[in-house]
Amino acid sequence: MLFHITHTHSHETCPAVHVDRRKTLDECWEALRTTPEIRVVEAYAAPLDHIFHITVEADDLAAVVKAMSPLNALGSAQTLPVMPLDDLLLLVGEGASRP
């Protein structure tokens, strides 16, 4: 299952600005990259907006929650299950969106 994570933090909690918070980011990123139940698909940062966009693949949400929880000390996150657009278009073509 694919999950898209959007993490947002403020300038006051930014790990790039506050060295003591950098350790939290490093530990969270390492957990995402090394947890066997999680595969990082893509990860991007919008540094001027203090936002991370991370897409991961995992069997369920529990492993993602465990790996991402430390980052909640720096800001907030939205985690959404997502699917490839090509897969959605196939479903729509099969009538999945019709009542």
Give the label of every model feature segment.
Residues 1-49, 85-99:
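Short S/T/G/P-rich N-terminal loop/turn motif that feeds into the first structured element of a domain
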Residues 35, 57-89:
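An amphipathic, aromatic/His-enriched active-site/gating alpha helix that lines ligand/cofactor pockets
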